């Protein structure tokens, strides 16, 4: 497993996303929520293979509670424990006191379900909650940290949000979507602002909901706007002598400042496959990055917006 040092932490490049452990998520053979035994097997396999960060949230079904019971079991067995990232929101606004109470109330609920007394990374799930009242959110997070309830603060965002605002927030980390097709925040300087801020940058949606694994032949014809970009991606991963997954992940991990990629897994075997994938990643050269930029600069916005897709598979 590859590791990255950030903010005094030695973090695995692979962070395990756990939304699948708390609710039925996605489509396919393993889309159903796993049994608790299967969930524990996923978590055990990840940590035993070197993954040292779990990503969850208070709206991921009972993911936090499942993790809490697993943590209790691991502690009793004297086994190593991972860092925990969880998220709260949306929040109740109206006054400072109302907002502060809701942040604290949600955080305490998270810690109770996780069976912990202190959280490693406390993340605001909705950028809009921060943007609505930046000064209040900064003060509230600082106040709660002074009480010893968490170590690091974070904000989750989408690519449509202002990364410059996040970079100036004073928070320790952010979580953002990024993939090989989406160059918007790279070209406008948003990614560089995050890197220059020294924040930990956690990434998600690396495979763009699996689009990188498809070919034009297995996509719905109504997604023909993707075809030229997929064909070029296929040409490039063959030229670079990488698998589609390895190129997609290598691209993200080659970006300045990126700390981790968050990936969910449906089975323990998939955890092992993803760990091997991280070992297959490479630092892309400037020439390779330039070829990717030339291929996907000015991409049709429908390609990087799954909300505009039709059913992908024939």
Positions of PLM-derived features:
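A short, structured active-site edge motif that brings together acidic residues
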Residues: 80-94, 122-125
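Acidic (Asp/Glu)-rich catalytic clusters
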Residues: 68-81, 111-115, 166-169, 192-196
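Active-site groove signature of glycoside hydrolases
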Residues: 111-130
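Conserved, mostly hydrophobic/aromatic
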Residues: 16, 39, 54, 67, ...
